[in-house]
Amino acid sequence: MASTFNIPCNAGTIKNFNNSQRNLGFSSNLGINFAKTRFSNCGDSGRIPSQLVVRASERRDNLTQQKTGLSIEECEAAVVAGNAPSAPPVPPTPKAPSGTPSVSPLSLGRRPRRNRTSPVFRAAFQETTLSPANVVYPLFIHEGEEDTPIGAMPGCYRLGWRHGLVEEVAKARDVVVNSIVVFPKPDALKSPTGDEAYNENGLVPRTIRMLKDKFPDLIIYTDVALDPYYYDGHDGIVTQHGVIMNDETVHQLCKQAVAQARAGADVVSPSDMMDGRVGAIRAALDAEGYSNVSIMSYTAKYASSFYGPFREALDSNPRFGDKKTYQMNPANYREALIETQEDESEGADILLVKPGLPYLDIIRLLRDNSDLPIAAYQVSGEYSMIKAGGVLKMIDEEKVMLESLLCLRRAGADIILTYFALQAARCLCGEKR
């Protein structure tokens, strides 16, 4: 067959057809035989005309059809005469099982299943994607040298900050997970006012400095809250009557955020749910010269029962009462808009919903009402349920894991904090390689 190319009239003169490949810029792997190149209306000038007709070579590297033995010219003549070589027959329509009723086709103007018939179609029309860039890896750290397993979270450990943590971060980076969030377990350093939270030589600042030294481009999120440092396990300072003090707690949180930023944190993440903390932290960071440090606010953090394994990991269960006076009621929907508006006005850079999968409607609500990036936290209870189901062979752990993360993305999450980050990224990279 012949192919026609439109080319500029002022192209250089062809001195030798054997050099046409170089002059015209065609690569040799195109299967074009330039010895059989036919130029139309060249005249005697030797100049390349504005229209070039090129015949394909008879060579085919991957030809699987049976050869007819005819030349290209003979094949073309046969087609013109209506004697084209026969193509494979149309495959027969699959037979229905015996007993299938005979019915007239439904009169449907649209059949959505047509766009699902092929893996190629399904991939082309996929609306939501998931990649390692969409996940943030939460990591638990402690002062010890050894990595200790967390019983309620299979596959998760309290990592020794000098060795185990570095190894885990290196594994994550191997599969393009370059964002982490660290949660400390400062065993014997709890106090009534959580002062260890802003100790610049404390576990978290030391860890940040070490990681930034080893992995300068690593994005480090930090947790801003007092519960790991407060002996009663609450996220704020508590009065003698068990009341969580808001403004006094915010004062401590500002010092904690500045200490983390000074150590090199990229994103500070207040998870305490105190009123006004985002604006106060933003002002404190800016005053200290850290205007480029982002704030990911736990905007809609619910008083959920899905946090149990996490609290075991950090030994941060409340010693009395619960956290319902500052975390949101799981029954509430519109309240999330109030928190969204407040956090946006106070200078938040990222809005987070926690937990994740049980609160897809809240993720979508924030996505539809804010232009800021939305984060979702697939919390410890969600992780442990999937792990347990996989161990008991009740579900396919890998497929459910990936589906759950894809659902969070579909609901509107730009990034997902998930303990599956490393496992999921390995699966995703394996699928694409």
From Swiss-Prot:
This is Delta-aminolevulinic acid dehydratase, chloroplastic. Homooctamer. Binds 2 magnesium ions per monomer. The first magnesium ion is required for catalysis. The second functions as allosteric activator. 5-aminolevulinate 1 binds at R311, K323. PROSITE patterns: D_ALA_DEHYDRATASE. GO terms for biological process: chlorophyll biosynthetic process; heme biosynthetic process; protoporphyrinogen IX biosynthetic process. GO terms for molecular function: porphobilinogen synthase activity; zinc ion binding.
